[in-house]
Design a protein with these regions (language model features):
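Nucleotide-sugar donor-binding patch of glycosyltransferase catalytic domains
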Residues: 273, 304-351
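Leloir-type glycosyltransferase catalytic cores
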Residues: 52, 153, 329-374
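Active-site and donor-binding regions of nucleotide-sugar-utilizing enzymes
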Residues: 5-10, 14-29, 51, 63-175
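A nucleotide-sugar donor-handling region in carbohydrate enzymes
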Residues: 42-46, 143-231, 331
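A donor-sugar binding/catalytic signature common to diverse glycosyltransferases
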Residues: 96-97, 108, 119-120, 147, ...
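N-terminal beta-loop-helix "entrance" segment that forms/cooperates
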Residues: 40-58
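Short alpha-helical donor nucleotide-sugar binding micro-motif in glycosyltransferases
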Residues: 82, 86, 284-289
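Donor-nucleotide binding loops and adjacent catalytic segments primarily
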Residues: 41, 49, 197-288
Length: 374
């Protein structure tokens, strides 16, 4: 029996882990046992517990409760906590997701004591080393035994860095080497699985009096925007003026901390500021919006999956396929660019090619892990 430890620390990682956990239970029961460790990097009822319940995955077996802190403090606490668990309990491998401090710390802790690391969403690059996430993903890829990249662009990024999808690049202590796998995207698996379910489980469109393709969904969470008063002001001003000029509602789920930073500026009555939403609620909003405006990588992708164009409120994106397809426009936190991007996307026919696999990435990932551990 293979024994795996899945390590998560933030809400998007719960969503990604749900796809693999579901397939493990449904198709690999009796062959693989999975335990879940939540680092507590981001943990409250809205951000985590609700998602476990909605996604139907087991509550974590471990929670490190590290909480917030500087990058160094948070990462160090997670390394220590993961190392303690991996030395007390035998695991054949560790699955990590994405690019958070939890991802980095888990990869460091596991690799130091020679437990194989399997990185889901490997190979993504923004080429912006000012982003903590860019540092995390680069280091994690170097330490991983299996690198599961969701797109051809991710594969090309890894090949440019010297990784090879066939030959082992380096050897670990157990004599096994690294392997890059073009797996497809587990979030696309989820989008196909949960789309119809969200229509049944959530009534947010009806409850808010919204109509199909007649509102904007905006999400803002990155510190580069939320901790920068000028950026935040530019984004809010652009949303306000778009709502007023185009007579369109803007749904804006905001963390209370970000809401406080808005100040007392007058906002158009069409700006609908609400509390952070559940998993099924965000799906329904993404599916029905005319345009999504976001600084979230995950929301960019989900909008694409559901055929909704996206204004990207960042200076770059890891998901370059979305921009190259014309389904997303990078506007950063620039007032004029946000206005122009919205008007360009709202008024044109947009195509959504199938860049992200066939909806069976999770099965491919698990099969590769089993082959690796034979």
């Amino acid at each position: 029996m293979i024994k795996l430890l899945t390590i998560i620390g933030a809400r998007p990682q719960i969503i990604k882990a749900a796809a693999i956990s579901r397939v493990l239970r449904e198709k690999f029961a009796g062959q693989i046992t999975e335990h879940i460790l939540h680092t507590g990097q981001h943990y409250d009822d809205n951000m985590s517990d609700v998602f476990f319940r909605e996604l139907g995955i087991p509550a974590p077996d471990y929670n490190l409760h590290v909480g917030s802190g500087s990058h160094g403090v948070q990462t160090a606490k997670i390394i220590e906590g993961v190392e303690d668990i991996l030395t007390e309990q035998h695991y054949d491998g560790v699955i990590v997701y994405g690019d958070t401090n939890s991802t980095l710390a888990a990869a460091v802790a596991a690799s130091k004591i020679h437990v194989p690391v399997f990185h889901v969403e490997a190979g993504l690059r923004s080429f912006n080393m000012a982003m903590p996430e860019e540092i995390n993903r680069i280091v994690c890829d170097q330490l991983s035994s299996l690198l599961f990249t969701p797109t051809k662009t991710g594969l090309q990024n890894l090949q440019a860095e010297g990784f090879d999808s066939i030959k082992c690049r380096v050897k670990f202590a157990d004599g096994r080497g690294q392997k890059v796998v073009l797996s497809g995207d587990v979030m696309y698996d989820n989008s196909m699985y949960f789309s119809a379910m969200a229509d049944i489980k959530s009534d947010i469109i009806e409850r808010m009096g919204l109509s199909h393709r007649n509102f904007i969904l905006a999400t803002i969470h990155r510190p580069a925007n939320t901790d920068n008063p000028e950026n935040l002001r530019n984004i809010f001003r652009a949303l306000n003026d778009i709502a007023e000029k185009h007579q369109i509602d803007v749904v804006l789920p905001l963390h209370p901390r970000t809401r406080k930073m808005m100040g007392d500026d007058r906002m158009d009555e069409r700006i609908k500021i609400i509390e952070p939403v559940s998993f099924f609620e965000i799906i329904r909003l993404e599916k029905n919006a005319r345009v999504v405006m976001t600084d979230s990588g995950g929301v960019q992708k989900e909008a694409f999956f559901y055929g909704t164009p996206c204004v990207i409120l960042r200076p770059e994106t890891e998901w370059v396929e979305i921009v190259e397809a014309g389904a997303g426009i990078i506007a950063d936190a620039d007032y004029d660019r946000i206005i122009a991007a919205y008007e360009a996307l709202a008024g044109k026919q947009v195509h959504f090619p199938q860049f992200f696999g066939d909806g069976h990435a999770s099965e491919k990932i698990i099969s590769e892990i089993m082959d690796y551990l034979k």
